[in-house]
């Protein structure tokens, strides 16, 4: 289905997305859809997405941060520039240049706490269809916007265990985040998300993890109060060790979604992680991929 407007609730924030010169493929957001006019004020974010065919790229000026990296699974070079905004209405602007191997020549995003404008210049036939939040700059905006509200995004799997506690497992890709989530599912837990979540301060002073729309597959808008953090690695045997303080903040930060990166946002992210995570039992965990690890984790949390 194609549409000119999408409304979705993500991590308790209502997004209103409007398309100009394009249309949206709504499948990635279908499970997060909300009714029109469901929120206002600080709980609402308005996003405009424009398709700019063969338009010149924005001028790069007053660069705060820049980076070059391989872009996702396409193995293409991408350049990122974090610039000062052209107007006091915006917090900052991010400009992305892509290689010709990709579908996009350049893209720009400018944003504030409650508003964003994304412009995309395509160089191949796209039939004018954009999939919101499968596009890298909108994911970066989602990360930035959550940081402005005391939260952060992190590569992780999260399950809600049988006792209602949310368990977050984080590590680099390929370490076993999805594996351990599915092991817990086999022992009675419910998977909230098995790749990436938003963490925000909870109403009770703790923290809550939220599923978000993903690039490759559908998600449901689930959330859970966090009761344990686990920095995982694969091991010939199961072992677990309690961690506290700065070690926890550093480990969470290393797997958070925060690019493009600069000093001001780094300090804000450190504060958000500290506020959300330092009251939650945290552990390094070596595990072998069988059900025995579930008992190891549950026993560790009983003594935490």
Regions found by a protein language model. Give the residues of each.
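Post-Walker A alpha-helix
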Residues: 180-181
């Amino acid at each position: 289905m194609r549409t000119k407007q999408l409304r979705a609730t993500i991590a308790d924030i209502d997004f209103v997305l409007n398309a100009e010169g394009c249309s949206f493929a709504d499948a990635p957001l279908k499970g997060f859809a909300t009714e029109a006019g469901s929120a206002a004020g600080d709980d609402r974010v308005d996003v405009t997405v424009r398709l700019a065919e063969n338009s010149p790229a924005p001028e790069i000026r007053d660069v705060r941060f820049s980076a070059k990296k391989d872009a996702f699974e396409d193995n293409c070079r991408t350049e990122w520039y974090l610039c000062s905004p052209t107007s006091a209405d915006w917090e900052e602007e991010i400009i992305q240049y892509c290689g010709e191997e990709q579908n996009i020549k350049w893209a720009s995003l400018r944003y504030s706490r409650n508003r964003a404008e994304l412009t995309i210049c395509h160089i191949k036939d796209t039939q004018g269809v954009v999939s919101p939040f499968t596009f890298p700059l909108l994911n970066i905006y989602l990360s930035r916007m959550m940081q402005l509200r005391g939260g952060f995004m992190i590569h992780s799997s999260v399950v809600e265990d049988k006792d209602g506690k949310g368990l977050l497992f984080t590590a680099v890709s390929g370490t076993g985040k999805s594996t351990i989530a599915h092991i817990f599912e086999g022992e009675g837990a419910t998977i909230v998300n098995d790749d990436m979540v938003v963490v925000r301060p909870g109403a009770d002073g703790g923290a809550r993890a939220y599923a978000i729309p993903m690039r490759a597959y559908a998600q449901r808008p689930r959330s859970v109060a966090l009761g344990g953090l686990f920095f995982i690695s694969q091991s010939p045997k199961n072992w677990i060790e309690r961690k506290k303080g700065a070690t926890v903040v550093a480990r969470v930060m290393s797997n958070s979604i925060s690019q493009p990166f600069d000093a001001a946002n780094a300090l804000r992210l450190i504060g958000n992680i500290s506020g959300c995570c330092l009251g939650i039992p945290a552990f390094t965990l070596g595990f072998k991929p069988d059900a025995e690890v579930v008992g190891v984790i549950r026993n560790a949390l009983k003594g935490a």
